[in-house]
A protein has these predicted regions:
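Loop/helix patches that line or flank the sugar-binding groove of alpha-linked glycan CAZymes
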Residues: 1-148, 154-159
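C-terminal beta-strand-rich structural cap/linker in extracellular carbohydrate-active enzymes
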Residues: 179-194
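Beta-strand-rich binding/interaction modules
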Residues: 158-176
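Residues at the C-termini of beta-strands that transition into short coil/loop
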Residues: 68, 173-176, 188
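Flexible, charged surface loops at secondary-structure boundaries
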Residues: 143, 165-166, 185
């Protein structure tokens, strides 16, 4: 498939989770609130705001967070969309200054994809026994020359799994600086070649 990187994803921008309806511009969210809370009384305001905080299209529309200045360096004036409150911690300037940032990790992933045809053309196979695993997604990509093992932890927990091939495998990329083989840390992503 074709990978997509949405604006802000390359620096780890998050959903804004604005607390008040007035913080949103998305008419779909605003209209849904009024319809379900005010008109039909199907939901209370607090429950609906939790839903909007997660699902509003405004989450994908907040201004790009360029730096930690007012309005995140996006504008000299109040932008139409509110700036995500975490812009001082998550912004382009900070990402470019950190060699271990998400930005540089994405660059390494893109470089790996361009340099290894197995990633785009290799055969996919779920690692046997991984079908029922609710914490780890592990699969291989294989062509005539190369086999890759991809291990992804989708949880905030440290998980232990044993993969026989790791003894002879070379770690190509990880979002942690060190490799603990069978220990897969929270949200860890590792790619091995063997």
């Amino acid at each position: 498939g074709t990978p997509y990187i949405y604006e802000g994803e390359e620096i780890g921008m998050t959903n804004a989770y604005f607390p008040k309806l007035e913080d949103y511009v998305d008419l779909e969210s605003i209209n849904a609130y009024h319809q379900l809370v005010d008109d039909q009384h199907l939901l209370d305001g607090e429950t609906m705001m939790k839903y909007i905080a997660i699902h509003s299209r405004d989450n994908a529309r907040t201004p790009m967070q360029w730096d930690d200045s007012e309005y995140a360096g996006f504008s000299d004036h109040t932008p139409w969309e509110k700036v995500n409150p975490n812009y001082k911690q998550i912004n382009v300037k900070k990402a470019l200054a950190d060699k271990n940032s998400i930005f540089y990790y994405y660059q390494k992933l893109i470089e790996l994809r361009h340099s290894m045809p197995v990633i785009t053309n290799g055969r996919y196979a779920l690692v046997p026994g991984n079908e029922e695993d609710e914490q780890i997604f592990a699969y291989t990509r294989q062509d005539d020359d190369t086999t890759l093992l991809v291990i992804l932890n989708y949880t905030d927990e440290t998980v232990n799994r044993h993969y026989n091939v790791l003894a002879d495998a070379k770690l190509l990329i990880s979002n942690y600086e060190d490799d603990q083989n069978g220990t897969i840390r929270p949200y860890e992503a590792k790619v091995y070649q063997y």
